[in-house]
Each structure stands twice: as structure tokens, then as C-alpha cells.
From Swiss-Prot:
Bias type Pro residues, positions: 536-553
Domain C2: 1-125, 132-255
Organism expressing this protein natively: Homo sapiens (Human)
Annotated binding of Ca(2+) 2, by residue: 163, 225, 227, 233
Coiled coil (UniProt feature): none
Needed co-factor(s): Ca(2+)
Gene Ontology biological-process annotations: cell differentiation; cellular response to calcium ion; positive regulation of dendrite extension
Protein name: Copine-9
Alphabetical list of SMART domains matching this protein: C2, VWA
GO cellular component entries: extracellular exosome; extracellular space; plasma membrane
């Protein structure tokens, strides 16, 4: 059963406030300095169109403005959120800018601002031929109410009896309302068996997940009777808001559970029971942005499957086939994930390995060879450098086998084991086409890595059945090896074929793939930091570009 019309819209990781300054702008006014204003545009993932998001105020007579009006953006770590900042000289009397008043522009992703040192970046303005346009300075700040965590406990009384041979097995489902009137599921309680008066365990939920920062937004709560076959029986519903829930810090709050169908059919219908909010508290916690702002770097490593089951790279049927018109599935997956994660790595150097190939000249089989053929330094410069090394390896190595994951997992784990202060977190992307040959060793490697600052993303390409991969993705059952369970869930698996867009819109389908494989990374990083009691370091002190001294006459 699908629970109550939940949409697939994700809750933003947080809300980010962008502060804008400019330095050394073009001077277009004859008798005074320019009167600048900045316009922010965001890019639609679907159409790639730029849409105006907002404008700063106009500041008169300056080439070095520090704008007061800020931009507040929803931030999704797992998405490439492209921004464009256009700077204009504005006639302050009419507040109108003309094309000739264009002072320059800058393009960058929101992740680049957050991933900059202290969540600050400075970019050169361009767009006016033959002119130096100056620079734009951007600072990202997380809104404080986005770090709040609500903890609450509820009980119910005299719920409707739904089971023929016993009482109900009730549970609650929480939904956040969206601006378009739909609802998104945001929490489910546990099932309390065989009772009409359940007391549920206390639970915690980010306030942003409950109401997206809008304290008066409707929160709908459905009450269900659990059934083994999944056809859970609807008992009733009630609505509230974060603001109303928070009143329970001082008093119990009782809600009537109403079943609209029963209410219409039965004149004497009163309710289907009541739910009482027993306790409610709010605490703040450190967020993903806190750690990134404090200097935590995401170290991205790539491992690519070079086994023979991929097919001859020279043949169009191969998963590694390099068409002049289209990237291979391997290259598309690598580009989609890497282009987002690189914003959080200051040196943009990425170790990249292959596994399952015979290497020249003697034909040695390797399960962790550097794609750039440099054993001393496997780093590639940027995602383009990784792709270049991958294409070069396809021309020089012989695809072979078997498919071993453990060597490359252990390789990254050895590097992660040297970091214990929260300064670095490792993300390993494995792209593969088939069945793992070293399942036992891979499970052992994952269990060992689960105590380290490390996450593993697996993208399965091709038509193979990936049951073994699903087993490694510990969403339902925690991975175990020799009776030892993984300390944390650190693996995320997705099959590439689920993201092949029949309409041919590769940009959108690869954005969806990146979104799904990266969505769990912030929480996995936070779970590691929490279990080790590692607090984010304070951001480095602000060091803005000084306002140039006025020219001497």
C-alpha cells in the first residue's frame, strides 16, 4: 500500500543565506561612480533556462559595494545548483538598468560557495569585452533554525478496533505539506501491537523535514492499523503545525482522530479516538554545512570495472564503448557524481583506479591499478582528468577479471584510517557491471570501513541482476561479516538503468542519478562525526578583499 499521497519531493538539506560584495567594478558614470545592483539567476535542471531569483538593493556612487539585502536559497548537497550573478549600473531614480549598464557576471554552483574556505569565494567578473570588470565576493551562512531537531512522544486513546480477532496494531505517519497542496511523508513511528491505547517511543526529526522552516505549515498525521500483507487499514487523521506542537513543551496537547468517510456516513460519529502529545523538545545540532565551513574536505576516489564482461570497448555493444556522439554509461555516471562532489575538495585532485584488467607489458592481473599509470601518484586533475585517464586506460589494458571490490575498498580505508580529527571524509565511487567475485572479503572490508570517515557509492551499469549489490546497501539489513556488524550504513547502491531517460534528456536523468547516490552522504558524514564526538572546527577568520584606497588627484 502507498501511504497517503506522499510526493517524491525531497526536503532541502538546509537554507543558505548568500551575502554579496563587489570590488573594483567598472565605472560607467561620467561625473560620479557607478550605482551597482546584483541580480541572481538560478538554472532549471529540466530546461537549463536561467530564471531571476532576486535582486540586491542599489548602492549609489561606489565601485566597492557591500550589499545588505541577502539571497536565501534551499540547499541540496546532492544537486548541482548553478547560479549566475549579473551586476548592473542602475539609474537610482528610475531603478531601471539598460544593457549598456551591464558591469559583468559570474557563474558558479552553490556548492562551490559552501565548499570554499570558510564558505567564502571570490570570482572574477567577466562579460564586458576588453574590460577588467572587478570581482564578486560571496559568503554562505546557514540559517540558524535549520539546525533544530524536534524530539516528541505521543500516545493514543480508544482508537477504532480494526482487527477481527484482536485489537488494532497502530502506527502514525507524519506528512509535511508542500506549497502546491500535496503532502510529503517525513516520518513513520513503530507499530505497537494489539492495543487501542498505544504509547509510541520518543523520536527525533529535523524541524526542516517537518515544516521546511515554516512554523505555521500544516503537518498531517495519519493513524493506521498495521497489516502483515501491507494493506494497512486507515483509522483516521488529524492536522497540526510545528508552532502548535511546540506548545506541548508546557502542556499536554490532545488531538481528535477523525475518519472523513465515517464522519459523512454516521450522524452520531464523534471520532476514531484521540492522540495525545506527551512531550516535545527542541535542540540544536551540528550540521553538514558546519563541518564543511570548518574545513572538512571530501576526498573523492573512483574505481572502475575493467572486467571482460563489459565487452570489447571497440564494439558498440560494450558498456565501455567510446562513441563520438555519446559518453559511455561509466563516463556518464562518473561525471554526474564527480562534478558535484568536486566542489567540496579544495585541491580537485582525485585518485582513480581500475580493477579486473591485465596490465601491459607482462599481462599481470590487477584489482587496483591507477588509471593514470602512476603508482606513486594516482591523482587526476579534476573530473575531466579522471575521464581522460579512464579513456587512456581503455586503450592500453586488456579487460579480464574476476570482479574484486575488496582491494580498492581496503586501499581507500587505509587512507581514511589515518584521519581521526574530522578534517577529511572519504567517498569511494565504484562503477561496475556485474556479480562480485569476492563477496565475503568485500563484506569484511565494508564492516571494517564502517568505523572510518568513509562512504561507498556503487553504480551498477548494464543489464545484470544486482541482488548482491542490494545486500551491500545496508538500508534494510546491516552488513555483517563473521558475526560482526557494520557500525554504520556506509554503502549506497543504484542501478544505472533506472536513470536512462527514454526521451533522451541525459542532463536531467544524470542529475537524478547523482541526487539519489549522493543524498545519504551528508547524514553518513554526520553519523561518523557524532559517534566519534568530533565537533566542527571554527571557520577560518574572514579575510575579505580590502576596499582599495581612493586614487590621489
Amino acid at each position: 500500500m502507498s501511504l497517503g499521497g506522499a510526493s517524491e519531493r525531497s526536503v532541502p538539506a538546509t537554507k543558505i543565506e548568500i551575502t554579496v560584495s563587489c570590488r573594483n567594478l567598472l565605472d560607467l558614470d561620467t561625473f560620479s561612480k557607478s550605482d551597482p545592483m546584483v541580480v541572481l539567476y538560478t538554472q532549471s535542471r529540466a530546461s537549463q533556462e536561467w530564471r531571476e531569483f532576486g535582486r540586491t538593493e542599489v548602492i549609489d556612487n561606489t565601485l566597492n559595494p557591500d550589499f545588505v539585502r541577502k539571497f536565501v536559497l534551499d540547499y541540496f548537497f546532492e544537486e548541482k545548483q548553478n547560479l549566475r550573478f549579473d551586476v548592473y549600473n542602475v539609474d537610482s531614480k528610475t531603478n531601471i538598468s539598460k544593457p549598456k549598464d551591464f558591469l559583468g557576471q559570474a557563474f558558479l554552483a552553490l556548492g562551490e560557495v559552501i565548499g570554499g574556505q570558510g564558505s567564502r569565494v571570490e570570482r572574477t567578473l567577466t562579460g564586458v569585452p576588453g574590460k577588467k570588470c572587478g570581482t564578486i565576493l560571496l559568503t554562505a551562512e546557514e540559517l540558524s533554525n535549520c539546525r533544530d531537531i524536534a524530539t516528541m512522544q505521543l500516545c493514543a486513546n480508544k482508537l477504532d478496533k480494526k482487527d477481527f480477532f484482536g485489537k488494532s496494531d497502530p502506527f502514525l505517519v507524519f506528512y509535511r505539506s508542500n506549497e502546491d497542496g500535496t503532502f510529503t511523508i517525513c516520518h513513520k513511528t513503530e507499530v505497537v501491537k494489539n492495543t487501542l491505547n498505544p504509547v509510541w517511543q520518543p523520536f527525533s526529526i529535523p524541524v526542516r523535514a517537518l515544516c521546511n522552516g515554516d512554523y505555521d505549515r500544516t503537518v498531517k498525521i495519519d493513524v493506521y492499523d498495521w497489516d502483515r500483507d501491507g494493506s494497512h487499514d486507515f483509522i483516521g487523521e488529524f492536522t497540526t503545525s510545528y508552532r502548535e506542537l511546540s506548545k506541548a513543551q508546557n502542556q499536554f496537547t490532545v488531538y481528535e482522530v477523525l475518519n472523513p468517510r465515517k464522519k459523512c456516513k454516521k450522524k452520531k460519529y464523534v471520532n476514531s479516538g484521540t492522540v495525545t502529545l506527551l512531550s516535545f523538545s527542541v535542540d540544536s545540532e551540528f550540521t553538514f554545512v558546519d563541518y564543511i565551513k570548518g574545513g572538512t574536505q571530501l576526498n573523492f576516489t573512483v574505481a572502475i570495472d575493467f572486467t571482460a564482461s563489459n565487452g570489447n570497448p571497440l564494439q558498440p555493444t560494450s558498456l565501455h564503448y567510446m562513441s563520438p556522439y555519446q559518453l559511455s554509461a561509466y563516463a556518464m555516471a562518473l561525471k554526474a557524481v564527480g562534478e558535484i562532489i568536486q566542489d567540496y575538495d579544495s585541491d580537485k585532485l582525485f585518485p582513480a583506479y581500475g580493477f579486473g584488467a591485465k596490465l601491459p607489458p607482462e599481462g599481470r592481473i590487477s584489482h587496483q591499478f591507477p588509471l593514470n599509470n602512476n603508482d606513486e601518484d594516482p591523482n587526476c586533475a579534476g573530473i575531466e582528468g579522471v575521464l581522460e585517464s579512464y579513456f587512456q586506460s581503455l586503450r592500453t589494458v586488456q579487460l579480464y577479471g574476476p570482479t574484486y571490490f575488496a582491494p580498492v575498498i581496503n586501499q581507500v580505508a587505509r587512507a581514511a584510517a589515518k584521519i581521526s580529527d574530522g578534517s577529511q571524509y572519504y567517498v569511494l565511487l565504484i562503477i561496475t557491471d556485474g556479480v562480485i567475485s569476492d563477496m565475503t572479503q568485500t563484506k569484511e572490508a565494508i564492516v571494517s570501513a564502517s568505523s572510518l570517515p568513509m562512504s561507498i557509492i556503487i553504480v551498477g551499469v548494464g543489464p545484470a541482476m544486482f541482488e548482491a549489490m542490494e545486500e551491500l546497501d545496508g538500508d534494510d539489513v546491516r552488513v555483517s561479516s563473521r558475526g560482526r556488524y557494520a557500525e554504520r550504513d556506509i554503502v549506497q547502491f543504484v542501478p544505472f538503468r533506472d536513470y536512462v531517460d527514454r526521451s533522451g534528456n541525459q542532463v536531467l536523468s544524470m542529475a537524478r542519478l547523482a541526487k539519489d547516490v549522493l543524498a545519504e552522504i551528508p547524514e553518513q558524514l554526520l553519523s561518523y562525526m557524532r559517534t566519534r564526538d568530533i565537533q566542527p572546527r571554527p571557520p577560518p577568520p574572514a579575510n575579505p578583499s580590502p576596499i582599495p584606497a581612493p586614487e590621489q588627484p
